[in-house]
Amino acid sequence: MVARPVRSIEKDACMSFAEWLKSLVSTRGKTLSMYRSGMAKANRRDYQGAIADYSAAIESPEIPPDVKAMAIYNRALAYSAIHQDDKAADDLAMVLATPGLPENIRTAAQQRRERIRRRGE
């Protein structure tokens, strides 16, 4: 008799953990899907759509830090493509302020920021 309630509690705990894990993976999956959708839209030159998708991914609490930095960088490129240089520069500043940013991304962001600055002169 005692074993049945214990099994039931263990089963309930496992089910709760499984449901929590599934929701975590699902939220992360949705975030990465938004990021990829932004990339596809940018490739089709749908910059407004790309900006919306990148913004949705960036706002997600489940976005991995490296993907967030790339989403912000790519959003900056989309802003730059539609000549919203102030917003592009703000995004590039956010990218450059990201701790642990890989050097190649840092260099690309600095170069893009410099091009935007020169274009504004």
PLM region descriptions:
Residues 29, 67, 104-107:
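Structural signature of alpha-solenoid helical repeat junctions
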Residues 36, 74, 111-112:
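"A position-specific structural signal for the A-helix of alpha-solenoid helical repeats
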Residues 61, 98-100:
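Alpha-helical junction/boundary sensor with strong preference for TPR arrays
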